[in-house]
A protein has these predicted regions:
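Cofactor-pocket helix-loop regions in the catalytic cores of large enzyme subunits
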Residues: 1-60, 64-66
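Glycine-rich, anion-gripping cofactor-binding loops and their flanking helix/strand elements
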Residues: 46-107, 123-134
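Extended interaction regions within the primary functional domain
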Residues: 1-2, 20-21, 27-33, 70, ...
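Glycine-rich, acidic loop regions that bind phosphate or pyrophosphate groups
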Residues: 1-11, 96-146
Length: 146
């Protein structure tokens, strides 16, 4: 794990299936091991983030679906649940929409879901922790290293 200390305090009566907090190093390993990864790209990204995400897509030769431009998120989730993709990375999607979509994938498919947004997403299987913009850009740069 990175330098950050993040306390895990389970809430009373909560589901134990929360996202594991992950690091850029682990995300890189997941992408390299995946047979068919895909990136779901939302529109909630600032210019600095967009540049780094474009480099990230190029570096790992990821298939990309832009939502809502190319496909509605709910239709996309149904598509992913029945597809041969084994790893789905999410970035730039409105938090509460992604929460619902990731819950559906978690319950009804075998797709490994990873949120690479700057906010922790408990409904994916893996997620970056809550990050400031500076820390988030650093995480994205670490994804591009090596």
């Amino acid at each position: 794990m990175d330098e950050r200390f993040i306390a895990y305090i389970p809430t009373a009566g909560s589901n134990v299936a929360h996202a594991e907090i992950t690091s850029p190093k682990l995300v890189k390993m997941m992408i390299k091991r995946a047979k068919k990864p895909i990136l779901i790209l939302g529109e909630n990204l600032e210019d600095k983030e967009k540049e780094l995400i474009e480099k990230f897509i190029e570096k790992y030769n990821l298939e990309v679906i832009k939502t809502p431009e190319e496909m509605n998120l709910m239709a996309l989730i149904k598509f992913l649940a029945n597809s041969s993709y084994d790893l789905a990375l999410f970035v730039g999607i409105t938090y509460y929409y992604l929460a619902q979509a990731a819950t559906h994938l978690k319950q009804f498919s075998n797709v490994i879901t990873v949120s690479i947004d700057k906010y922790y997403q408990p409904n994916t299987l893996y997620s970056f922790p809550n990050l400031s913009m500076e820390e988030y850009l650093d995480y994205l740069n670490k994804l591009l290293e090596g």
